[in-house]
Each structure stands twice: as structure tokens, then as C-alpha cells.
A protein has these predicted regions:
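N-acyltransferase acceptor-side catalytic subdomain
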Residues: 1-161
Length: 161
């Protein structure tokens, strides 16, 4: 699914309307004492959207903020990223593969990757999550959310924060 996963300079991040995935945001976080890294990756459009036929390679990147949580462990935080939003059925497997691919780019003491996704909720399209006035009732229980997001993954390691 993913190829060309490699580090790059944060000032080389692609332009995006998502502020938290920009070189500027990296500078803001660095001025506050955070360590940041940028990572390039590519994916076939068919692996993201299920469209058969034309093979198109999509290039993307993401900004990762590293946080030391104590003297022994750190966490990786991806604010409002990745920007690519696969079709619902490919989201879990995409993030799983991205996470595994990022392992070699992260410190050895990094114990987790937290994604604050800017993707549309799975449940935003389901009518039973809206009341008679069309107002969204909210997401289902955490266990249902985790089950749905882990669907199609190999390791079932995603947890709802």
C-alpha cells in the first residue's frame, strides 16, 4: 500500500490548508521546546479509494510532534493528519501500515502514535445516528468505534483516545 516512506526536513512539508501539518506549525512547536519530524510517503490511489484500473501514485507527507512523557518514554503525535483520507473500508489498514512504516523514523523509546484525524466520522452518514430533526446524536460507544476502525487491519491495535 505505502512506498517511499522516508524522513525529510520540516521546511519541505507540502503546502496544505491544515495549519497543524505545516512547516510553520513545526516552527511554532519547536519554539515551545517540542521536537518535530516530517515524513514523506506515497500510496497507490487504488489502495486508498478502491478504484480499479488507472494506477496513480499519490505523494503525501505528515508532521509528527514528539513528546517526552518521562525520562524513559516518548509519544508521537500527528495533529490533524494524515491529510489523505482513504475510503471508509481502507482507513484502518492505511493507518496501520502507515504506523508500522513510521516505526523506523521514531525514537526507540516511542510507545505510541496518536492521530488526531480530520476525517469525516464513520457515523456522519448513518441516519440512525441522527434524531427526527436531523441533529447528530453523536458517536456510538467506544468499543463499537474501535471495532469499526480496526476492521480490515491485521493487528487490531487501534484504541479510541
Amino acid at each position: 500500500m505505502l512506498s517511499n516512506v522516508r524522513p525529510k526536513e520540516t521546511d519541505e512539508l507540502y503546502a496544505t490548508p491544515i495549519l497543524q501539518q505545516t512547516a510553520f506549525w513545526s516552527e511554532v512547536k519547536a519554539s515551545l521546546g517540542a521536537n518535530t519530524i516530517a515524513v514523506n510517503f506515497a500510496a497507490e490511489s487504488a489502495d486508498l479509494y478502491g478504484a480499479a484500473g488507472e494506477k496513480q501514485l499519490i505523494h503525501s507527507d505528515l508532521l509528527i510532534i514528539l513528546r517526552q512523557i518521562d525520562r524513559n518514554y516518548s509519544v508521537a503525535y500527528v495533529p490533524h493528519g494524515p491529510e489523505l483520507e482513504p475510503a471508509d473500508e481502507f482507513q484502518g489498514i492505511f493507518l496501520e501500515e502507515l504506523s508500522e512504516s513510521l516505526r523506523s523514523q521514531l525514537p526507540n523509546n516511542c510507545i505510541l502514535i496518536r492521530y488526531d484525524l480530520c476525517w469525516e466520522s464513520y457515523w456522519a452518514k448513518e441516519s440512525d445516528h441522527f434524531d427526527e430533526n436531523g441533529l447528530w446524536r453523536g458517536e456510538p460507544e467506544q468499543s463499537a468505534q474501535e471495532f469499526r476502525f480496526n476492521y480490515n487491519t491485521h493487528e487490531w491495535n487501534f484504541r479510541k483516545a
